[in-house]
Amino acid sequence: MDVGNKSTMSEFVLLGLSNSWELQMFFFMVFSLLYVATMVGNSLIVITVIVDPHLHSPMYFLLTNLSIIDMSLASFATPKMITDYLTGHKTISFDGCLTQIFFLHLFTGTEIILLMAMSFDRYIAICKPLHYASVISPQVCVALVVASWIMGVMHSMSQVIFALTLPFCGPYEVDSFFCDLPVVFQLACVDTYVLGLFMISTSGIIALSCFIVLFNSYVIVLVTVKHHSSRGSSKALSTCTAHFIVVFLFFGPCIFIYMWPLSSFLTDKILSVFYTIFTPTLNPIIYTLRNQEVKIAMRKLKNRFLNFNKAMPS
């Protein structure tokens, strides 16, 4: 964006999900509860994995990083939306809008690569178990996580740099509860067809391609598991099922929004709520409900906490 344009446009108005006061109060309560649940649930996973030595394995190291990303993804816009519903203040500065775009694509891009790393971990564990220790070493796990963040930063920087080149001519109303390129593009004084192609090529195709790779890897894993009836295979099937549910819930909305960036705003708003608020809340539930090791570790952590409180002098 040129300097003259930026000086005349200093903020956007976030229209949110509804203009109805009753619905806004409803959203305020629901999203407040979901946000607290997201932070508590994912924090419990992180603390449990750190405290319990039985969970010091590559799979749970990656799961811990997924929980950290989910907490970050839920925090880049949800707290502002909650306070906006309470105060009625719905504006965001131009720099604040760019910041939201940056962090949204940073966390989603990082999560996409991390989910692929988790899929690779399960593929090696189930399809090539004899090579697991040598292939998925602690160094490899750290490298996968670092690579995820680096690729997330590169992707988000490309989105922000492109947004900086856009001229805006008003009205400066973002038809969503946070800034993202599909809705911000609608305010630009340029051909939206070209902008749509940019979104599809830099986000939509990447998300779709990664989902196809993940889907194929889980199909291979499930076919491998089908030929075994051991308890270990049953455990592997349960873990992979949980992973795939997470992948589907996260990728589905992203693919729709970025493969069809000029689609209905109402549909986009609903899907945006899903992958920025609901999915980070559901991930801890999905993993703990289908994972006996995590549930046992959490019970131990709870008992240690209760015993510590009993031992404290009154």
Swiss-Prot record:
Membrane topology: Multi-pass membrane protein
Entries under PROSITE patterns matching the protein: G_PROTEIN_RECEP_F1_1 (PS00237), G_PROTEIN_RECEP_F1_2 (PS50262)
Locations listed in the record: Cell membrane
Predominant location category: membrane
Keyword Glycoprotein annotated: yes
Entry-linked InterPro entries: GPCR_Rhodpsn (IPR000276), GPCR_Rhodpsn_7TM (IPR017452), Olfact_rcpt (IPR000725), Olfactory_Receptors (IPR050427)
Glycosylation sites noted in the Swiss-Prot or TrEMBL record: 5
Keyword check for Transmembrane: yes
UniProt cross-references to Gene3D superfamilies, sorted A to Z: Rhodopsin 7-helix transmembrane proteins
One cellular component (GO) term of this entry: plasma membrane
The entry's keywords: Cell membrane, Disulfide bond, G-protein coupled receptor, Glycoprotein, Membrane, Olfaction, Receptor, Sensory transduction, Transducer, Transmembrane, Transmembrane helix
Transmembrane parts of this sequence: 26-49, 58-79, 101-120, 140-158, 196-219, 236-258, 270-289
GO molecular function: G protein-coupled receptor activity; olfactory receptor activity
Extracellular side: 1-25, 80-100, 159-195, 259-269
Pfam families (alphabetical): 7tm_4 (PF13853)
Cystine pairings recorded for this chain: 97-189
Record-linked SUPFAM superfamilies: Family A G protein-coupled receptor-like
Cytoplasmic face residues: 50-57, 121-139, 220-235, 290-314
Role, per record: Odorant receptor.
Family of this protein: Belongs to the G-protein coupled receptor 1 family.
Protein name in the entry: Olfactory receptor 4K2
